[in-house]
Amino acid sequence: MRAIAETGFDAIYLIAVINIGILMIRRCEGNQQYRLFGSMAVILGAGDAFHLVPWAVALCTTGLEDYTAALGLGKWITSITMTVFYVLLYYVWRKRYQVTGRSGLTAAVFGLAAARIFLCMMSQNQWLSADPPLSWGIYRNIPFALLGLLVILLFYQSAKEHKDHAFRWMWLTIVLSFGFYLPV
């Protein structure tokens, strides 16, 4: 029963998020913020597919232990696409609040993203192993958590400063996103 429920949920989620993202990109009519959100949705769905499709196959067949390498590879790809997702979210912030300059801040965002991706690429992660080291999971998540904290603070401060009713809870959605992602 678990296999059917999880697989069904994952399929609906992947189809929905990728299609919504594609529709947003196609219908953005020059609105760069809208295009960025659409791109984020496609990247999120595509990245998650690398983890969720092997997960669903494993659940519906011989079990997770027989798909260790595929699941590890999916987790690796998802780690990188989530990093790109948050870099794009930074650009949503820049567009929404018409931020110009701030090259130091942009350098920090790209530096944290590069550090995260570099750490994800290290063989010590043992992505394809049945028992990857917890320490490397922590190391690679440090720059990611800092990137997330930075984006959270930017949205919180800007929404408050601009009295942006539509985005007043954006910071909280990012916190929840991290809360759901980090255990994975």
Name each model-derived stretch.
Residues 1-19, 137-143:
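Hydrophobic transmembrane alpha-helical segments in integral membrane proteins
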Residues 8, 76-80, 142, 146:
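Hydrophobic alpha-helical transmembrane segments of multi-pass membrane proteins
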Residues 12, 24-28, 34, 96, ...:
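Anionic, Ser/Thr-rich low-complexity intrinsically disordered regions
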Residues 19-27, 50-107, 118-125, 153-158:
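Internal transmembrane alpha-helix with an interfacial aromatic "cap," most often the third helix
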Residues 32-45:
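Loop-to-helix transition at the N-terminal end of transmembrane alpha-helices
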Residues 44-47, 115, 144-153, 167-184:
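Hydrophobic alpha-helical membrane segments
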Residues 102-108, 133-139, 155-176:
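Membrane-helix boundary/juxtamembrane motif in polytopic membrane proteins
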Residues 127-153:
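Extracellular-loop-to-transmembrane junctions of the mid-late helices
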